[in-house]
C-alpha cells in the first residue's frame, strides 16, 4: 500500500479522547490529527516520539490529517492505523505474498457468518477447495525487554477478539478452512505469542481454536513514509 503523497513527519505531543492526537510540525505549528486506533497503543504513543501523518482531500473532514506511523526512541517503526491491517492483508493475498493462501478464485470482505452475528474480514473461495475464513489482527505490542523481538496480541482484554476465535473454531469444526492472520506492524517484532498475561481467556480460546484446526499465520510488514506492505512470514509461538 503506497502513500501518495508521502507521509509527513511531526513530533507527538499527546494522544487523548482515543481518537485525537496533538502534534508539533518542524515549523513549530501545533496541529490536531485523527487517530484511528482506539486501543491501548502500549509503546506506540510516547510523547516526544516522531510520527507520520497522511492528509485527506475530503473537505467534510473536521481533522483532515490521520496518524499513520510512529517511531520509537529505539528507531522501530509502527503502523498504528488499525484500518490498514485488512487493506494490507487483501493486498498481500492478491499479490500472492502469503504462500499459504495462494490458489483461490474469489476474495470477499466483511461477509456475515457464524452464530454470533459476526462479519469475517476476508472470505476466500474456489471451486475445488473448502471456503477459507480469515480473521485479521494487527500486532504492535513489543516486549521491550525481550532480546529476541517478542511481540504479543492482544494489548488489552478483547471480548470482540474472543468472539472471533469462537466463530473461527466453529468454521473449522464444520469443515471450512479457518485462519487467524496476524499482520505484524512493528519493525522490532520478530515472533508473536498470545498475551496470556494480558488476556488469559483469549490465550485459552486460541489454543482451543488451534486444536480444532484453526491455522495461525503471522506476516510482518515493511514500513516507510511512502509504502507499507506485508513481506514475510514470522514465527507464532503459543
Swiss-Prot record:
Family of this protein: Belongs to the SfsA family.
Gene3D superfamilies (alphabetical): 2.40.50.580, 3.40.1350.60
PANTHER family, per the entry: SUGAR FERMENTATION STIMULATION PROTEIN A
InterPro entries: SfsA, SfsA_C, SfsA_N
GO MF annotation list: DNA binding
Full protein name: Sugar fermentation stimulation protein homolog
